[in-house]
Amino acid sequence: MKRIILTYTLAFSLLSAYAGEGGSPPLKNTDKSLLIDYVDPFIGTTNFGTTNPGAICPNGMMSVVPFNVMGSSENTYDKDARWWSTPYEYTNCFFTGYAHVNLSGVGCPELGSLLLMPTTGELNVDYKEYGSKYKDEQASPGYYSNYLTKYNVKTEVSATPRSGIARFTFPKGKSHILLNLGEGLTNESGAMLRRVSDSEVEGVKLLGTFCYNPQAVFPIYFVLRVKKNPSATGYWKKQRPMMGVEAEWDKDQGKYKLYTRYGKEIAGDDIGTYFSFDTEIGRAH
């Protein structure tokens, strides 16, 4: 029996610039009638080329790139394991989200932040546990797609000059969209989130230290909107470890704490937000 699945569309805008309602990524041209149909975005994505196959417009401020360089020993390379920095490596296999705002072909630990990840089942905000292997990669100018085997989720992303667009196709059941502000390629830390509504958050993330320049630091501002109203929303934050008696009464010490009822601003070095959905069969949005 064919399984009917539901698609959520969201728009991720940089510098608080929103380019309209989130829509579907452009259809791919299969007859090679345009010169861009001969472009292979995977060129340079391995052997220290440090390019990436993500979606970006020419001279665009937003790029949406698969982030597969952390979280698993099964990867060929890890972002912190050698003198090598890129949000994407072709031979790696473990996906922990889509990074927004990236450098391609540079090789310095900068940007590669605002990690957006779809998951299913019980909510888990630890990237080492919620990451997934993937298959069926496709990329063309302005478009990227893959299939997360852990969750049976198809992911698709595209970009406008100032915003990113993502479409996640979930199976029936509980599903989540996670925004991780604690991890990324940059060596800088610190972020703030504010919930505007059940379907929208805005915030700021500190980036910088380009090519090991510790004072080259700057903030970026963003807005994230989901098209469908979630069944639940919340934050998370990594708690400091405690010792002795203090540790006995705080079950979240040293772990990721979920904030399920707190709705005001939140800030920290390792924070994030989630949107949860109840995916139904045959219901389109």
Predicted region positions:
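Intervening/peripheral non-core polypeptide segments
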Residues: M1-K2, I281-H285
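Bacterial Sec-dependent N-terminal signal peptides
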Residues: M1-P26
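Accessory carbohydrate-recognition regions in carbohydrate-active enzymes
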Residues: G22-R283
